[in-house]
Amino acid sequence: MAKQSSRELALERRKALSNSGKKSTTLNGSSPNRIRTASDARLTRTDQSFVKAGKESVQLTAPKREQLDTSFVASRESSGASRRQVKTIRNSSRELVLARRDELSRRGQPAAKSKDRTRAEVEKISSKVSQQDAAKKQVNDLASDQKGVDESSSKSLKSLDTVSRLSSRNSTSRPSAKRRSIQNPSRALVLARREAQSKHGKTAANQPTSAASVARQGDPDLSSREISQRVRELRSKSGATGKKRSGACRPCGPNRNGSKQAVAADAHWKVGLSETSTGQVVTGTQANRSSKTTGNEASTCRSITGTQYLGSEVFDTFCQSAPQPGQPLKVAVTNTSHGNRVTGNEVGRSEKVTGDEPGTCKTLTGTEYISANQANQYCGVSQPSPRKVGQSVTEDGRKVSGVMVGRSEKVTGDEAGSNRQLTGDQYLGVDPLPEGRSAEKVGSFNTLRGAGVTGTNVARSEYVTGNEPGSCKRVTGDEYVGPQQYNTFCGGKPNPEAAKVGLSLTNKSQTVSGTLTGRSELVTGDEPGTCKAVTGTPYSGVEQASGWCDTNSVREIQDRTPKLLGTPGAVMTGLQPGVGGVMTGAEKGACEPLTGTPYVGGDQLVQACGSDAPAGSNDHQGSSESSPWTHFSVQSPARAMQLQRDPRSGVTGTSYEQGSQITGPFNMAVDKITGTEQFRFDRKQRHFKSVPVEATPNDVSQTRPESRVTGEGQSAGLNITGDDWDRSERVTGTEGASARRRNPTRPGPMSAMPAADLKRNEEVSQPMSRVTGSSGNTDQGSLITVSGGARG
């Protein structure tokens, strides 16, 4: 029993704390007045002998260990002796905690072997663990210095063996069913729930509340047979009260009251709901003034500071008007420009605060924390800021939120494909595209000569300052500014410069681009050979011949240029693998145009196909004798002699001027008489007229007009009278050669020196530069110029 009261112990403890602090020996050690009795003491691992044995087990010698191996009785005696010797326990929990911390500091987390335990597990383990196992663990840790107690240890060993056998038998045998007294089912259910919560905590509340689960929660060691017995016992007493039903039970008895049955009055709510004067909802126990309660009339209609807990219905019922708030709201509710609600301290502009006027109506980026009501009050219009997270709807009606990647008026380069239907995941909403077109990233305009130019527009603009100088001046070199600049800022566009790269059309209707090598008005010395036909690759266009030559020269140049046509070709002689003959099977594809070397003549193709002949089949048929390719371009001596011999027809004797009119023997007829002329290699077939030639009468009176000139001056058989030199009905005179001799005339003015002939070269002004062939030259600078560019 304790010899000191609790007050004396407290005073002693405080005195020790004031003298030596928390390290006082009176605090760590147990006082003699707090000694446990022998009945309270039991063998634990925090026993002093148990701790000392752990330290002395390291100092065991080899002979002592052999004695422990050969004689197991000595170890049992030590356990019995330790149980007899009851000593004082000095703060065993503190020593256990210190030992555990020491092990954790040395070995770390593996030294922590403690686990979470419940009361059910502790009881289950304590019933199964035998005293024999506890004695074996103590033998391995105790020292061998207790040799004088062999007899007592042997007796204790026998008693321990008997106890262990009994405990092992009891553990192996199945526990018999315990008889329980009849209890109230609801009380048993509550007790089982509390017991389960004490063992398993909050997890026990989530378990089902069936009869079997309740029985298992009360005693987890029950077998399935015992649980079924408990369930049957409960159902035999209470029926199906604990069983869940799918629907409500229908009344089975007669309704005696009928329609006169009164509706049960609703009970008073434990948790009330009211609304403050500022529109906030307050829930909880209602502390409002009530007509059924006396003593709460004071200060009902006064304004108070702090949290408002009275509902607005109190002021409407007992007061004439609502109270005026004396201080700003502690938590304000405002709306952003996009309609989102923001709660907290209101940091906007206020009429009672000065110095916060700058930046009131400016749009800020980032999180919007200023109310839209402020913009309406001080600025007049609320300008919504750009959304950080946009919302849209797809074509199927699904909502899409996030960064909007659609087309915008403030972004360039996203115009391509904006109106196309794409496959895959839809990331654009059904919102209409913005009106108007943004600034073009790649501009398109025309030069002064009409050529198209694409790229970044570097011309003068109304939105850019500093680019006014030189906007209306003419610049040589590559033209990169369109006529829009001259029409907008200069009033008109200048004449285009000489083309650096010209375009021309050859005789074969092919386009040639590059530096033009034809005749030019600005170049002298290139007149010879302008209108001559040149064979080979044409490098001059038809426009050169049309501008400087007559029609005959242009036609000759066009005829001289061969046209490389495919099928059909020119008229061919010899064996032709053509179509339209006696061979069958050649009709397929005969009238289709082919490329390559022509092996079918145009005459044969026209004869076989008719109107289905390809285009250009008659081009070779129109060649005449005057065409350039029908004559030799070089006159050899033999060719010259042949041309002289043909018109003279030096061979006589067989054909005459009118051979068909000659009569005589048959062998002198045409093509029947052989001779030198018919054996010539280059003879030409003569065509004789077989029809008689009609003689034309020479009637002068019908062809010559009637003359009215009479007199002696008549020289042509007519008599001319009068003095008139012109033929008239009333004038007569001389006419003829005599009249011309009598009246000589001059065709024009005569001078001693002949008149100078006007030539074209005198009309052309003298060029400033001695180098010709390019444009943009001056009389200063280098004499060598780059075609199409500035002098350098």
From Swiss-Prot:
UniProt KW Repeat keyword: yes
Sequence segments annotated as region (N-terminal domain): 1-235
PTM comment: Has been suggested to undergo ribosomal frameshifting, as does its ortholog in H.neapolitanus. The exact position of the putative frameshift is not given, but it would probably occur in the sixth M-repeat and remove the C-terminus.
Stretches for region Middle region: 240-615
Region (Disordered): 1-259, 280-299, 338-359, 608-662, 687-792
Subcellular location: Carboxysome
Annotated keywords: Bacterial microcompartment, Carbon dioxide fixation, Carboxysome, Repeat
One Gene Ontology molecular-function label: structural constituent of carboxysome shell
Compositional bias ranges of the Polar residues kind: 17-36, 69-82, 161-175, 618-636, 651-662, 764-785
Any one Gene Ontology BP term: carbon fixation
Gene Ontology CC terms, in alphabetical order: carboxysome
Region feature C-terminal domain, mapped onto this chain: 616-792
M-repeat repeats: 270-319, 330-379, 388-427, 441-490, 500-549, 560-609
Skewed-composition ranges (Basic and acidic residues): 1-15, 97-106, 113-126, 218-236
TM spans (from-to): none
UniProt keyword Repeat, yes or no: yes
Residue spans of the N-repeat repeats: 7-22, 94-109, 187-202, 225-240
Region called C-terminal peptide (CTP), residue ranges: 763-792
UniProt cross-references to Pfam families, sorted A to Z: CsoS2_M
Stretches forming C-repeat repeats: 633-678, 703-738
Domain of life: Bacteria
Domain comment quoted from the record: Has 3 domains; the N-terminal domain has 4 short repeats, the central region has 6 longer repeats. The C-terminal domain has 2 repeats and a highly conserved C-terminal peptide. The C-repeats serve as the encapsulation signal for the alpha-carboxysome, and are able to target foreign proteins to this organelle.
Purpose of the protein: Required for alpha-carboxysome (Cb) assembly, mediates interaction between RuBisCO and the Cb shell. The protein is probably intrinsically disordered. The C-terminal repeats act as the encapsulation signal to target proteins to the Cb; they are necessary and sufficient to target both CsoS2 and foreign proteins to the Cb. The N-terminal repeats of this protein bind simultaneously to both subunits of RuBisCO.
Quaternary structure note: Probably interacts with the carboxysome major shell protein CsoS1 via the N-terminal domain; this complex probably also interacts with RuBisCO.
Family to which this protein belongs: Belongs to the CsoS2 family.
Protein name: Carboxysome assembly protein CsoS2
Organism per entry: Prochlorococcus marinus (strain MIT 9313)
Name of the coding gene: csoS2
